[in-house]
Amino acid sequence: MLRIGLFLLTNLAVLVVAGVVLSLLGVGNYRTADGLDLTNLLIFCAVFGFVGSFISLFLSKWMAKKTMGVQLIEQPRNADEKWLVDTVVELSQKAGIKTPEIGVFAAQESNAFATGWNRNDALVAVSLGLLQRFERDEVKAVLAHEIGHVANGDMITLSLIQGVVNTFVMFFARIIGDLVDRVIFKNEEGRGIAFFITTIVAELVLGILASMIVAAFSRYREYRADAAGATLADRGAMIRALQRLQAEMSAGVESPLPSSMRAFGISGGVRNLFASHPPLEARIQALRDSAHG
């Protein structure tokens, strides 16, 4: 899905900018003559860590529309758009959620995403490439997968996890900054320039490493969304859709999107730690195994 990349990038940007501004303003009374007041520091980091995460959440739908150039379907202009709207309405009713906004975006890559700050204020969009090359039952399965994300409340859960991660990134970055300032630069009178620079660098590094935790949750939720696609639509169609995506990627179909924003990426080695999606073959096998479970 596209939303994981957008969410992480927005969140990291908000976190770093907030950290810089707060440090320059001297906000946060957590440094005393005896060192850091860890309790006050943790409270301070939790407040601003969750603020950054939820700002990213509330901006996610707007950013997705602007970044991907999504054209909303308010009144279907042809039979394909009418089928798309009718299908999303049907799947939403099955999932027990309000019908999300529906849109398409001009990309030849087979892709789709869902985003939004809650189950009843979401957006589902598909690429023109997917609509043109996939069979309708396969498109329906992909849409069911995305509706599954919305129904499962994945974006809210992701925001809560990201809020916890942000809290500890800010917390440990400031501890590292304080240690460098006091121990290496021997600054005992307030925060020196070493504290500010070290804290910003530590936030960037720790933020990137912490993204592995968020990516691990994202991989887990992909399996759940695949299961939702199989339940709301059809298991066989869900498997065929993944196989078609796998074939396209194996054939080297060019993607205009960065890897973090692709709907169904394949990665290996260390890249798996940062991948927001499991390998396609693992997802296909999980669907097959669940059919016999």
Swiss-Prot record:
Domain of life according to the entry: Bacteria
Q: Which GO terms describe its biological process?
A: proteolysis
- Asked if the Swiss-Prot or TrEMBL record annotates the protein with the keyword Transmembrane helix, the reply is yes
Q: Does the keyword Hydrolase apply?
A: yes
Its required cofactor(s), as named, are: Zn(2+)
Q: What is its EC number?
A: 3.4.24.-
What are the GO MF terms of this UniProt record? Answer: metalloendopeptidase activity; zinc ion binding
Keyword annotations of the record? Cell inner membrane, Cell membrane, Hydrolase, Membrane, Metal-binding, Metalloprotease, Protease, Stress response, Transmembrane, Transmembrane helix, Zinc
**Quick one: which residues bind Zn(2+)?**
145, 149, 222
Q: Say which family it is in.
A: Belongs to the peptidase M48B family.
Q: Kindly provide the name given to this protein in its UniProt entry.
A: Protease HtpX
Annotated organism of origin: Cellvibrio japonicus (strain Ueda107)
The coding gene here is htpX
